[in-house]
């Protein structure tokens, strides 16, 4: 599954690699990889495979789940697909409270006293996941864990989740992606070294 998802992300250019002309993330980090999983929404077969893969992770690791929660904004559609298939209540979590109306940070299903799984599109440092998890816990939820489409495999993310003692699982990761990209002839052996060094240095 990990390699199939990685291949799909590369094929539809949800993930692009540019070892010799670095991207600039919103955080200012220079990176040879750019991931925009919102692209998957335009490909029914890919988004369906992602939905089913995430459902399998949930059934394997969090079978007692009662509410599906998406992180705003990219996690929301995948959470909706999953909740619909599993016939479960769903909500989503903003990065901060609204400035108007009821000023809610969580919209949708009530979380209090419920076992919740958080849906992310991408895990980089884990920061957005922690924001969502903390908001849900403050609302009285029992957060079981996080599932996501892809992770860069940064040590910082491992540390982030370890610090809040919460498990996370992903459909694919950086190592699988690099291997698939090499097998597909999209990158050279020199590119691989650049990609690995970037990840290790950032970690």
UniProtKB/Swiss-Prot annotation:
GO terms for biological process: 'de novo' UMP biosynthetic process; pyrimidine nucleobase biosynthetic process. Pathway: Pyrimidine metabolism; UMP biosynthesis via de novo pathway; UMP from orotate: step 1/2. It catalyses: orotidine 5'-phosphate + diphosphate = orotate + 5-phospho-alpha-D-ribose 1-diphosphate. Orotate binds at residue 124. It comes from the Bacteria. Its cofactor is Mg(2+). Pfam families: Pribosyltran (PF00156). Its EC number is 2.4.2.10. InterPro entries: OPRT (IPR023031), Or_phspho_trans_dom (IPR004467), PRibTrfase_dom (IPR000836), PRTase-like (IPR029057). GO terms for molecular function: magnesium ion binding; orotate phosphoribosyltransferase activity. Keywords: Glycosyltransferase, Magnesium, Pyrimidine biosynthesis, Transferase. Belongs to the purine/pyrimidine phosphoribosyltransferase family. PyrE subfamily. Homodimer. Catalyzes the transfer of a ribosyl phosphate group from 5-phosphoribose 1-diphosphate to orotate, leading to the formation of orotidine monophosphate (OMP). This is Orotate phosphoribosyltransferase.
């Amino acid at each position: 599954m990990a390699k199939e998802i990685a291949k799909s992300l590369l094929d539809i250019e949800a993930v692009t690699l540019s070892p010799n002309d670095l991207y600039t993330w919103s955080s200012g980090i220079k990176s040879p990889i750019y991931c925009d999983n919102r692209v998957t929404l335009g490909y029914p077969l890919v988004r369906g495979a992602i939905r089913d893969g995430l459902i399998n992770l949930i059934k394997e690791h969090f079978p007692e789940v009662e509410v599906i929660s998406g992180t705003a904004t990219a996690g929301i559609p995948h959470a909706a697909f999953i909740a619909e298939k599993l016939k479960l209540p769903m909500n989503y979590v903003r990065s901060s409270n609204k400035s108007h109306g009821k000023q809610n940070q969580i919209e949708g299903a009530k979380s209090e006293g419920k076992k919740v799984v958080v849906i992310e599109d991408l895990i980089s440092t884990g920061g957005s996941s922690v924001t969502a998890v903390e908001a849900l816990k403050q609302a009285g939820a029992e957060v079981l864990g996080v599932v996501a489409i892809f992770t860069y495999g940064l040590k910082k993310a491992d540390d982030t989740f370890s610090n809040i003692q919460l498990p996370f699982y992903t459909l694919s990761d950086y190592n699988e992606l690099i291997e698939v990209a090499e097998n597909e002839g999209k990158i050279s052996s020199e590119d691989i070294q650049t990609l690995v060094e970037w990840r290790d240095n950032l970690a």
